[in-house]
From Swiss-Prot:
Belongs to the class-II aminoacyl-tRNA synthetase family. Type 1 subfamily. InterPro entries: Aa-tRNA-synt_II, aa-tRNA-synth_II, aa-tRNA-synth_II/BPL/LPL, Asp-tRNA-ligase_1, Asp-tRNA-ligase_1_N, Asp/Asn-tRNA-synth_IIb, AspRS_core, GAD-like_sf. One of its GO terms (cellular component) is cytoplasm. Gene3D superfamilies: Bira Bifunctional Protein, Domain 2 (3.30.930.10), GAD-like domain (3.30.1360.30), Nucleic acid-binding proteins (2.40.50.140). It catalyses: tRNA(Asx) + L-aspartate + ATP = L-aspartyl-tRNA(Asx) + AMP + diphosphate. SUPFAM superfamilies: Class II aaRS and biotin synthetases, GAD domain-like, Nucleic acid-binding proteins. Keywords: Aminoacyl-tRNA synthetase, ATP-binding, Cytoplasm, Ligase, Nucleotide-binding, Protein biosynthesis. Homodimer. This is Aspartate--tRNA(Asp/Asn) ligase.
Length: 596
């Protein structure tokens, strides 16, 4: 046995005991023939006193040691209340160097700032630092809590395939060549969606797994090409059943950081979320809401406001902003694809100022403050144009205002469910936002193609797709979507109608989803589920900005791995064996055939 005790476990009750310890040299301090070594392992740090000069002079940071010694009370005045082991020290009797270390690319110290590229390139060193190590252990605890809760509720953990066929699910697949079937390819799953539905057909009425998922998306901030979901599906359930389960999971997870989340969590419809907050994942830690002014400006002479939608959001105290700050808002808006962000300053004397104010009628000027709830000293920002992008711009401005003015308390937690989302959206809009349309039709699914319409739209969703609402529900925390689910389609004819609307005829649907449609022929039960974005959930629990901080070996921008330098070319032999360059032989003409 290389050690008898963990370094972080030693306490006053161990005084007088001989112990064998193992760990890394954290810090070393020489004091006239005596060295004090902070020895660190996964459990914590203990101070080791080394009196042999020939031993301690050869020690360097991150050397790996085995120490045999006696636990002793620290001299009075030398206690360290910052350490759990701060009452004791270990007097070394034998020190063995188990391994040495080269000079480090950065210090193993959470108080030292280290660039992300260096951290990811040497991630194994970064994980020795207290912060990253704490995040990994918190993630493990979150896994444990979820598993225990679901196990108590009768859920069965089942692993689904990570090599499957390519099926359109809203993003691009990562594809893998099938060596034994040249010209054919596997795909890595974007989610376990189809398999978990087939498990319901198979009679596993309560399923879950902590699933690895893969999406070949264009680079977006804080996205990873491979990510983790807590994936759940159940039979004979309704929306309220899954929402209740989701709330139980959230409540248990947040108890890990000593936060009690009150339940039931409030619900808001998708339509209300977009109208009031300009987002389908609203941050409810503050109450600033958008105001629609389309009716208010219906007779306006101002050309910019002659638009399908006009809306506003108020920045409290914003009238005192310098011209430079107001110009910066215009650049901020342009970075989001807008032409700018119109504004009116409501001066302390009640007068309206700014470029927009001079274009308003006396009636509009007189009624504007009341219409938007502005007070003297506030700034009113406007967006005008098509409803969806205008609301999105105002919603982003709302959050920016919340941060800039201190309306958002970072210590607060605000959850909501967003329900009754549209079932479909124009395919062109989905593609423009970076998603992949499932079929060639004019409409594609907002969530995915397997989401059931609400009962009142069951007969009409394919005739009037713009009006159809889905049985979908997303859970949002502090403006982050942390989970989403739906009641699923479980009848073959309904699923075929959805595919047809999305531009998949019966032959295409059979080719791509035939195994699912076949399963629906044999008594598929009503079912529904939810998937939590596990990386985002743990990041929120850990209080970190990026999901990269809670993933053991994350990718950097563009899906690049600085540690292994993946992706990387493969050899010509590997290409040949994998059949990457396989081309089917052209069919030879029949020499006996005659021309017509």
């Amino acid at each position: 046995m290389l050690r008898t005790h963990d370094l972080g476990s030693l306490r006053s009750e161990h005084i007088g005991q001989t112990v064998t310890l193992a760990g890394w040299v954290g810090r070393r301090r020489d004091h006239g023939g005596v060295a004090f070594v902070d020895l660190r392992d996964a459990s914590g740090v203990s101070q080791v006193v080394v009196r042999e000069e020939e031993v301690f002079h050869g020690l360097r940071n991150e050397y790996v040691l085995q120490v045999i010694g006696t636990v002793s009370q620290r001299p009075e005045g030398n206690e360290n209340p910052a350490l759990a082991t701060g009452q004791i020290e270990v007097i070394a009797e034998k020190v063995t160097i188990l391994n040495t270390s080269d000079p480090l690319p950065f210090q193993i110290d959470e108080h030292v700032e280290v660039g992300e590229e260096a951290r990811l390139k040497h991630r194994y060193l970064d994980l020795r630092r207290p912060g990253p190590a704490r995040n990994m252990r918190l993630r493990s605890e979150a896994n444990r809590v979820a598993r225990e809760l679901l196990h108590r509720d009768g859920y069965v953990e089942i692993e689904t395939p990570t090599l499957t066929r390519s099926t359109p699910e809203g993003a691009r697949d990562f594809v893998v060549p099938a060596r034994l079937a040249p010209g054919s390819w596997y795909a890595l799953p974007q989610s376990p969606q189809l398999f978990k539905q087939l498990l319901q057909v198979g009679g596993f009425e309560k399923y879950y797994q902590i699933a690895r998922c893969y999406r070949d998306e264009d680079f977006r901030a804080d996205r990873q090409p491979e990510f983790t979901q807590l994936d759940i599906e159940a039979s004979f359930v309704e929306q309220d059943d899954i929402i209740s389960l989701g709330e139980s999971i959230v409540k248990a997870l947040w108890q890990l950081i000593d936060v009690e989340i009150p339940t039931p969590i409030q619900r808001i419809t998708y339509a209300d979320a977009m109208a009031r907050y300009g987002s389908d994942k609203p941050d409810l830690r503050f109450g600033l809401e958008l105001t629609e002014l389309t009716e208010f400006f219906k007779d306006t002479n101002f050309g910019v406001f002659k638009a399908p939608y006009v809306g506003a959001v108020v920045m409290p105290g914003g009238a005192s902003q310098a011209r430079r700050a107001l110009d910066a808002w215009q650049e901020w808006a342009k970075q989001r694809g807008a032409k700018g962000l119109a504004y009116v300053l409501f001066k302390e004397d009640g007068e309206l100022a700014g470029p927009v104010a001079k274009n308003l009628t006396d009636t509009e000027r007189a009624g504007l403050a009341d219409a938007v709830g502005a007070k003297p000293g506030d700034c009113i920002f406007f967006a005008a144009g098509e409803k969806t992008p205008s609301r999105a711009l105002l919603g982003a401005a709302r959050v920016e205002i919340g941060h800039r003015t201190g309306l958002i308390n970072p210590a607060d937690w605000a959850f909501c469910w967003v329900v009754d989302a549209p079932m479909f959206e124009p395919a062109a809009a989905a593609v423009a936002s970076g998603d992949v349309a499932v079929g060639a039709g004019q409409w594609t699914a907002v969530h995915h193609a397997f989401t059931s319409p609400k009962p009142e739209f069951m007969d009409s969703f394919d005739k009037d797709p713009e009006s159809a609402l889905s049985y979908a529900y997303d859970i949002v925390c502090n403006g982050n979507e942390i989970g989403g689910g739906s009641i699923r389609i479980h009848e073959r004819d309904v699923q075929e109608r959805v595919f047809e609307l999305m531009g998949l005829d019966k032959a295409d649907a059979e080719t791509k989803f035939g195994f699912l449609l076949e399963g629906f022929k044999f008594g598929a039960p009503p079912h529904g589920g939810i998937a939590f974005g596990w990386d985002r959930v743990v990041a929120l629990l850990a209080g970190v900005e990026s999901i990269r901080d809670v993933i053991a070996f994350p990718k950097s921008g563009g899906g690049y791995d600085p540690l292994t330098q993946a992706p990387a070319p493969i050899t010509a032999q590997q290409r040949k064996e994998a059949g990457v360059d396989f081309k089917p032989e052209a069919k030879k003409a029949d020499p006996g055939a005659t021309k017509a």
